[in-house]
UniProtKB/Swiss-Prot annotation:
Keywords: Antibiotic resistance, Cell membrane, Membrane, Plasmid
Protein name (database record): Chloramphenicol resistance protein
Keyword hit for Cell membrane: yes
Chief subcellular location: membrane
Cellular component aspect of the GO annotation: plasma membrane
GO BP: any one term: response to antibiotic
Lineage, uppermost ranks: Bacteria, Pseudomonadati, Pseudomonadota, Gammaproteobacteria, Enterobacterales
Cleavable signal peptide: none
Length: 302
């Protein structure tokens, strides 16, 4: 074998050198980005735990480790956390995994995929638009059960269409139901910040704990991964929806009691405000001593 064979551009080894060089560059860049992102992620977790008011509890005595377990002991924490996990899991599966699976099938074309995504997006937009008036009127547990019911209904319709190949039903029914369920599952936990002052501090602790434990490079939540490892629960999103629906029914009595106490407290605040305004108009109360306007707990989307 002559020396010209190694210098020939048609030789396989000479062709493989640029590929190996580009592969090394790609691996180096990826490793650099991973190191930087990991450092930033750890730094953000440290700052969240040290400086944010949600995790920095105003205390006089020393830190008690039992305070860190307060969100875990609360049933509402698990209820709304699983609700949010089911909603975000459905969102990522529908918009990231479903298009690739549908385009890989011979009977599915791109003309069917576009209306499917379009109808689901429209359903999510309209549902999120009216959540601000629906949640204060019906209550968070009722809206939560409705959203989980929509997710389960979408799963049943998808199973029916897979068996009988009813593509039009899948486009116009299951996607709309899934979109409504996703928007509801994401909106209801966020409404806790404005729905009740009794749950405000607990919601902040739960959100901070969830943000500190979540991984930004994972699209699937830890609960979905844990449920998938159980074996029979292959479709984890609908399993989470069923669990949330059951938990919401269990906490129905407790939620109704808390809502009654909250309504009584809110009525008392409104009564004090009206009384102070009437005294101010009569000149019997100075403006500085007038009670402030009571807080309204209606949830509004940006």
């Amino acid at each position: 074998m002559s020396f010209t064979a190694y210098s020939d551009p048609c030789w396989p080894w000479s062709r493989g050198r640029p590929i190996a060089r580009s592969a090394r560059r790609h691996v180096a860049w990826v490793a650099g980005y991973l190191c930087v992102s990991r450092f930033g992620h750890d730094r953000c977790i440290c700052r969240r735990g040290s400086f944010w008011p949600e995790t920095r509890v105003q205390r006089v005595a020393g830190l008690q480790w039992s305070q860190l377990l307060l969100p875990v002991k609360c049933l509402n924490f698990w209820l709304y956390t699983l609700c949010y996990a089911a909603g975000m899991g459905s969102f990522f599966v529908f918009f990231s995994i479903a298009p690739g699976l549908m385009m890989g099938r011979p009977r599915c074309v791109s003309a069917w995929l576009q209306p499917a995504v379009r109808h689901s997006a429209i359903a999510m937009v309209f549902t999120a638009r009216f959540m601000g008036s629906v949640i204060p009127k019906w209550g968070s547990p009722s809206v939560l059960r409705m959203g989980m019911g929509c997710l389960i209904a979408g799963a049943v319709l998808l199973a029916i269409t897979e068996i009988w190949a009813l593509h039009r039903v899948r486009l116009y029914c299951s996607n709309v139901a899934s979109g409504i369920g996703v928007a509801t599952a994401v909106s209801v936990p966020m409404a806790l910040f404005e729905d009740s002052t009794m749950l405000l501090e607990r919601s902040r602790q739960s959100t901070s704990a969830w943000a500190c434990t979540a991984r930004k490079h994972r699209n699937v939540d830890h609960f979905a991964v844990a449920a998938q490892r159980l074996g029979p629960c292959r479709v984890t999103v609908w399993t989470l929806a069923t669990v949330v629906l059951g938990l919401s029914c269990v906490s129905r009595v407790k939620g109704s009691r808390g809502q009654g106490e909250h309504d009584a407290g809110r009525a008392t605040n409104v009564g004090k405000y009206i009384k102070s305004q009437s005294l101010r108009e009569c000149g019997k109360l100075s403006p500085n001593k007038c009670c402030s306007r009571p807080k309204t707990y209606a949830f509004r989307l940006g």
